[in-house]
């Protein structure tokens, strides 16, 4: 991520205004859809998904027509199996470095204070693989705050990390040829786990969690990539030492080259909080009146800019009909009477602190050697007839 220098912003902003005048463009709200409009399919459609058992229900960007993603259109990732859980026998265990180990039923959890959050969840590998650009969705999540449960269990002074164990499990093979079966798990620091925004979630868009999205209980940690929002939770442990497993120390680790005083240093970091990002979703038209619609998320978004081909950046209109601190913002820009032929559409988001979604040739993206945290500017191709 980089900052847009003031001079560059002024120059590009002025160019954008000139471009807007030449386009005779007008700003319009992103939703609802215009009556009679036709969606034009992107030329760069995804190839077949080679791992349908792992990635299910990717968002089809051209179909994006609402702020909240319906449950039946929400993506799901499973690293192991997709467990079938009987609510009547399911229990949540809380243990480790606590004074009072606790066991809760789903009824116990639902009887506790209720908290809701609208949060856009994105897989950290989204757009990092050629067959994967729909690992994202926005939902209204409801459950009970995590922090009071940990406080009631009595976290010991030695506790430093909280581990969330899922019911899903599979075989792990280490380089030394040791094989074993292990449940999925991720951890975060005790301080991060105690964030009052985190909830143990049992409801999605007003309905019980769907099986593929974590029934009966999952963690919802607003502002974090999807991997941290553990599904099918069965146990929560407070640890007195750092937790490492496949999904903390090997997978979901970003590798980058960084320049330090003229020397290249290879840096590995664990995937955690979401990064600023945007993407064009669809292009629609009524006759010669075209409109580009998209979304921006991952940080408090101040504005979104769009460019067509190698033209200047133009400001997009952000739809303020629905909004929440951790939900995506939908945006649009009108594109009157584009020339026939193939065009590219690129978007970039700018957050309230001035950080700009990086271009694909920005060193933070270009020198990244893993597909995690792929928040570079997204360019789509389209053909205008």
How would you describe each model-predicted region?
Residues 1-17:
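N-terminal secretory signal peptides and thylakoid transit peptides that target proteins
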Residues 31-385:
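Structured, non-membrane catalytic/scaffold regions adjacent to prosthetic-group chemistry
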């Amino acid at each position: 991520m980089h900052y847009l220098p003031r001079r560059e912003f002024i120059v590009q902003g002025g160019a954008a205004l000139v471009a807007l005048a030449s386009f005779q463009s007008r700003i319009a709200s992103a939703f609802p859809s215009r009556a009679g409009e036709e969606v034009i399919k992107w030329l760069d459609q995804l190839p077949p998904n080679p791992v349908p058992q792992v990635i299910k229900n990717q968002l089809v960007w051209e179909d994006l027509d609402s702020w909240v993603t319906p449950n039946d259109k929400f993506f799901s990732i499973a690293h192991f199996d997709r467990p079938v859980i009987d609510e009547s026998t399911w229990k949540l265990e809380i243990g480790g470095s606590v004074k009072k180990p606790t066991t809760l039923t789903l009824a116990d959890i639902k009887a506790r204070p209720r908290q809701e959050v609208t949060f856009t969840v994105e897989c950290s590998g989204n757009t990092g693989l050629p067959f994967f650009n729909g690992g994202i969705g926005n939902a209204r999540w409801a459950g009970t705050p995590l922090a009071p449960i940990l406080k009631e269990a009595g976290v010991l002074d030695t506790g430093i990390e909280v581990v969330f164990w899922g019911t899903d499990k599979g075989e792990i093979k280490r380089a030394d040829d040791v094989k074993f079966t292990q449940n999925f798990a991720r951890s975060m620091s005790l301080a991060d786990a105690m964030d009052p925004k985190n909830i143990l979630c049992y409801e999605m868009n007003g309905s019980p969690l769907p099986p593929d999205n974590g029934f009966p209980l999952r963690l919802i940690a607003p502002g974090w990539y999807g991997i941290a929002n553990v599904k099918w939770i069965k146990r929560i442990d407070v640890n007195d030492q750092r937790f490492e497993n496949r999904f903390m120390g090997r997978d979901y680790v970003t590798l980058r080259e960084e320049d330090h005083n003229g020397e290249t240093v290879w840096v590995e970091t664990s995937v955690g909080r979401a990064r600023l990002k945007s993407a064009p979703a669809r292009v629609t038209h009524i006759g010669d009146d075209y409109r580009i619609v998209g979304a921006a998320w991952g940080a408090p978004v101040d504005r979104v800019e769009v460019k067509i081909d190698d033209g200047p950046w133009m400001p997009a209109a952000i739809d303020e009909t629905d909004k929440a601190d951790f939900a995506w913002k939908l945006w649009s820009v009108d594109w009157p009477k584009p020339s026939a032929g193939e065009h590219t559409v690129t978007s970039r988001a700018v957050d309230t602190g001035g950080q700009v979604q990086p271009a694909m040739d920005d060193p933070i993206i270009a020198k990244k050697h893993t597909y995690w945290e792929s928040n570079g500017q997204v360019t789509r191709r389209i053909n205008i007839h």
